[in-house]
Amino acid sequence: MEVPRLDHALSSPSSPCEEIKNLSLEAIQLCDRDGNKSQDSGIAEMEELPVPHNIKINNITCDSFKISWDMDSKSKDRITHYFIDLNKKENKNSNKFKHKDVPTKLVAKAVPLPMTVRGHWFLSPRTEYTVAVQTASKQVDGDYVVSEWSEIIEFCTADYSKVHLTQLLEKADVIAGRMLKFSVFYRNQHKEYFDYVRDHYGNAMQPSIKDNSGSHGSPISGKLEGIFFSCSTEFNTGKPPQDSPYGRYRFEIAAEKLFNPNTNLYFGDFYCMYTAYHYVILVIAPVGSPGDEFCKQRLPQLNSKDNKFLTCTEEDGRLLYHHAQDVILEVIYTDPVALSLGTVAEITGHQLMSLSTANAKKDPSCKTCNISVGR
């Protein structure tokens, strides 16, 4: 079942007791997590309702979970409702002046356990939460008898599933625009980066863990290893732009060296950074590689010859490449890439740091690139 939200109803088990309002609960006060009741409470005397214990959380998704617990059989038949206190786990490093998330208080009828708690308006992907439970018995006058709070349990919600990513993919399809020809992938970095690759990695760029840019629920952030490339071209020249936010030195490599019939293509994310520009993250993985296996389990696979973002087709024995015009593609290649397969040269344009997407946070209010999952 889906549990309804009680916005201003239950007192938190981690705070002093407060009156429950709405839902005809005006006269009730709940215990805090230490089991203390207000001395002047209007609540009926507790009749030893069983306290939930041995709480189990499973079937966790990015916006739902199942919860169950054990309880003594004594007075079990008098339980009519469950009160659930759900809070984001406190981040000690968070900005103290930032508005705190309002704790979510849920009330549910006493259905058979396990019970599903679902709601994208109060559950965010890849986020740590604490949860505690009370049992309650509704009286004829509308008041409740409640148990003490259970122990506090911690859990973390999951990443976006393939289903959620497919929803993002469908939204990205809408704005991708027409396709433009291109012939090279490129990667900008500082000169020191390429010197380090030559001196310490045998002249081969190595995959590294993807940063946390993009959607908060993306399954590749902080997990997928790869090398970042671009393929955007200037409309009037058909060549890569001379400006870059990532460094004045550019490695260029022929497109067929990275993207060919021996690789698979995956959709990774769709996001923006409070601007009109939208970004699509794609992953290219050699067939059967560790990166390919990682993506196959987590990401929607694209038809390399027919999709709205990046294509590789054959014509007269040659491979032709096209990229979407109206989104900025960020391409992640999951294997090492030898510098000898391409060229490194200094660009003639500017280093536009303001356009960097390193650890960029997605605009959660954008209707173009958000789905109804998490906040």
From Swiss-Prot:
Domain of life: Eukaryota
Entry keyword set: Glycoprotein, Phosphoprotein
Pfam families: fn3 (PF00041), PHYHIP_C (PF19281)
Phosphoserine sites (modified residues): S11, S12, S15, S24
InterPro entries named in the record: FN3_dom, FN3_sf, Ig-like_fold, PHYHIP/PHYHIPL, PHYIP/PHIPL_C
Gene Ontology cellular-component annotations: cytoplasm
Ranges for domain Fibronectin type-III: 51-160
PROSITE patterns cross-referenced by the UniProt entry: FN3
Glycosylation sites: N22, N36
Family classification: Belongs to the PHYHIP family.
Job description of the protein: May play a role in the development of the central system.
Protein name in UniProt: Phytanoyl-CoA hydroxylase-interacting protein-like
